[in-house]
Amino acid sequence: MIRNISDEYVYKKEVDWSLLMEGLTLPVDNQLVFGQIMGRFIHRGETKDITLYLEGKSYSAKIVNVNFDPRFKRKKDTYQIRYSRNGDLAKALQVYFAKSYQFIKAARDNRDPTDRKMIKLPDEYKEYLAIYTTEYDDSYILEPILVDDMQLLRETVKKH
């Protein structure tokens, strides 16, 4: 239970191509937390400007409640955090998550162009991006959890 919303962990996203390029979709469970933090829920088709901080540098982004075509008969809202494709944040994430980026890029370059399946990283390449709230309803802190960090954690756990 969140007692104080400021500086609380909100979500951990496994790195994938979308995250490295333009954004991420928030699971339904996390949408409630984001709505509480913002002080309101955004309606379908609505966006809210936000600031994401990565290693002390600020980046502009948006939280979007996706307005899907009515033909899809979506009952639940879908929140996404979006930023400019190949913009400053995307480029910074590609640098931080260089191992994941290189693995996914090589797999995309070497597959059949008609294959649109999401490329999953093997365990030894898995990296994550943790999202934390701040005292402001439009600002979030991003923390990279790199593959080297994960390997160090596994080794530490094995020793104990």
List where the protein language model places each region.
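Acidic, low-complexity intrinsically disordered regions
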Residues: M1-H160
